[in-house]
């Protein structure tokens, strides 16, 4: 299935990382530290959180300050994953990190009422998603076949390579993500954006009214300090 919109949305948002996004990244780092300590290499949760923070423009100095500050912070941060069915059966997954679970659930119920959606049973939505690494790199005078050969010869578990005039979009199994990034850097590729994310296996179409409802839901979640990110399987549309 076409994948360009997956990374394109991320690239557009990266142009200007908001203060709220920075706060959410800091909270994700804090949660990861509380889970597994401050060593980036031995704590897989922290490694992913740091990688995302770097991709969104945070400096390593800022990240290190967040890590050390989180080590001393005694605030309990709880992690939540809510699965939702929205208009026309669109599947939605909401990931939250909060020090107040009741506040998060209350807010989410309010958003759901306006969406005309409902909470789903565990794994009833997740089953339609798979975790992938997405890496967006400048073409660097490479041909697509040459890039594929480079990745496969180094045992990268590749899913797909797509491209436009300037960039390649590489989709791969998440267990090859960090290996692939190092390989690309060694071969002088400039990484524009990258992330491990959930990608839908099947997508659904929404009509204009349903698109509006989902857009409002996504905007509300984006403004909520307790919600880290949201994924869904609706086909993209023009705002």
Swiss-Prot record:
Biological processes, Gene Ontology terms: regulation of DNA-templated transcription
Keyword Cell inner membrane among record annotations: no
Keywords assigned: Cytoplasm, DNA-binding, Transcription, Transcription regulation
Gene3D superfamilies named in the record: 1.10.10.200, 3.30.70.980
GO MF assignments: DNA binding
Cellular compartments per GO CC: cytosol
Domain of life: Bacteria
Record protein name field: Probable transcriptional regulatory protein MG332
């Amino acid at each position: 299935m076409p994948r360009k919109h997956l990374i394109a949305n991320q690239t557009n948002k990266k142009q200007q990382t908001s203060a709220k996004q920075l706060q959410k990244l800091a909270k994700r780092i804090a949660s990861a530290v509380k889970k597994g300590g401050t060593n980036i290499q031995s704590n897989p949760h922290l490694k992913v959180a740091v990688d995302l923070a770097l991709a969104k423009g945070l400096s390593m100095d800022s990240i290190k300050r967040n890590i050390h500050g989180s080590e001393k912070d005694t605030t309990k941060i709880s992690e939540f994953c809510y699965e939702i069915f929205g208009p026309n059966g669109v599947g939605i997954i909401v990931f939250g990190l909060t020090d107040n679970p009741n506040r998060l659930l209350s807010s989410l119920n309010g958003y759901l009422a306006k969406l005309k959606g409902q909470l789903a049973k565990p794994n009833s939505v997740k089953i339609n998603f798979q975790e992938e690494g997405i890496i967006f790199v400048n073409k660097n005078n490479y041909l697509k076949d040459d890039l594929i050969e480079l990745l496969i010869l180094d045992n990268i578990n590749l899913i797909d390579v797509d491209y436009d005039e300037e960039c390649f979009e590489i989709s791969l199994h998440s267990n090859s993500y960090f290996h692939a990034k190092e390989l690309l850097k060694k071969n002088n590729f400039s990484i524009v954006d990258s992330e491990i994310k959930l990608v839908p296996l099947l997508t659904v179409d929404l009509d204009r009214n349903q698109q509006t409802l989902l857009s409002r839901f996504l905007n509300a979640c984006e403004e909520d300090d307790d919600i880290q990110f949201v994924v869904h399987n609706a086909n993209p549309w023009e705002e």
